C-alpha cells in the first residue's frame, strides 16, 4: 500500500504544474522527474495488477484531500509511477461521445482502461494517447 503523504504531496504538485505551465509541459516535467527518482523497492505486484492497485490508492487518497484533484492530475501521477516501474501503459485524453461538453484523462494498458468505470470505452472517445514510456 502506498503512503498517503507522498501521494497527496505529488497530487498537489501535479495539479499546480498543470495550472501554471499547462498540460504538455507538465507531462514532460512529470516524466523527467519519474526518470530521476530512485529505483522503486521490491513490489509484490507487477503489470496491470500493480497499475490497478496504484490507481485505487491514488483515488482513495485524492478523495480525502480538500481540493479534490480531478482526472488529469491523477492520471499523470499514475503515469509517472508506471513509468518508474517501466510498465507499458498509455496516458489518454478523450471527450464524451453523447455530445455533452466534458473531457477525461485516464491510463490504459493493452487498450483497456485502468481502474475506470465499465462504460468508459463507450462514454468517451479517445482523442489523444501517449505511451508513459516515451520521452
Model-derived segments and their meaning:
Residues 57, 74-135:
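Hydrophobic/aromatic-rich core segments of domains that either
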Residues 33-50, 57, 102, 110-112:
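Intrinsically disordered, low-complexity N-terminal segments that are enriched in acidic
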